[in-house]
């Protein structure tokens, strides 16, 4: 599931300058959507590239006129209506103005906004979810229980967006009933809280890999080859690197160049990944040849515990360098190998931690990621392929 962060920036937030500061902070932090009033759409679009959702009053004639001029990516009904309690809920939802608006052909809104005051509004939110692409729910007195109920009942009918005020609230919403909300609507002016919420979103979307140790069975000099350094647009931590190897089923953990040495400065944005033929793991679970990498591509950063995140390639630097062939054997006797540059700055991960490839010896245990699948054009497939 891809999670999203929405930022509330309508007239309830304050005057335009206040809303503008909030929206700008959201764009800089990397939120996915801003929720604004219809009259703000044009000037919000001038602030930067962002998905814009706009409250609409639900009048079909006004909506049709607005649709011709508006640049909103989605329209939301419910503000100043039944959804936020301005208009009383009808005893029979078949008479609901908000639901009727959502059911219109043509210029119908894309989503509904509901404040959960009690069980009646919870039921109303469920009815909205049956009609809307996006269902935004704001818990007034209770937050977790109504959200749990809606997650259990709504399923995949709609993108369920839960109102929150902090990053920790967002984490709870994302984790509720394990499935969690599809997104959160954040209501805060705190820049740090906006950034932390985006970080929580990213964390929730990260893959966690099972890494294991394989025994080094051979390490030998092989002469020169075209070696690739992957220079990313991200700074990596001391325990981070990438998964690379000659065989997609068995990839070696290679550390980023974060360590200082007397002879060369650290390059914490770089992984010296090996020869051009090798694979590197990508965020979608596939692989790419090192020779194919170019600026703008996505690669997967992984730490020694298997936690992952994405990074953008800024540059792939190819140079002829002397190489080592590193061969290892997994617990189930599968042989894997790769070519790594013969240099002290290239570090793999052994039971002793960061270890220079020049210090590796047969019998050492080296950190890898092993899968019982082959790849075809970078996609995992169930097929018998011999690689040697």
UniProtKB/Swiss-Prot annotation:
Q: EC number(s) on record? A: 1.4.1.24
Q: Which UniProt keywords apply?
A: Amino-acid biosynthesis, Aromatic amino acid biosynthesis, NAD, Oxidoreductase
Tell whether Zinc-finger is among the UniProt keywords.
no
> Entry's Pfam families?
DHQS
Which reaction(s) are listed as its catalytic activity? 2-amino-2,3,7-trideoxy-D-lyxo-hept-6-ulosonate + NAD(+) + H2O = 3-dehydroquinate + NH4(+) + NADH + H(+)
Instruction: Identify a single GO molecular function assigned to this protein.
Output: dehydroquinate synthase activity
A GO BP entry is: amino acid biosynthetic process
Q: What does the UniProt function comment say about this protein? A: Catalyzes the oxidative deamination and cyclization of 2-amino-3,7-dideoxy-D-threo-hept-6-ulosonic acid (ADH) to yield 3-dehydroquinate (DHQ), which is fed into the canonical shikimic pathway of aromatic amino acid biosynthesis.
Q: Its family?
A: Belongs to the archaeal-type DHQ synthase family.
Q: Which NCBIfam families match?
A: PRK02290.1-1
Q: Which PANTHER family match?
A: 3-DEHYDROQUINATE SYNTHASE (PTHR33563:SF1), PTHR33563
This protein is called what? Answer: 3-dehydroquinate synthase
Q: Which gene encodes it?
A: aroB'
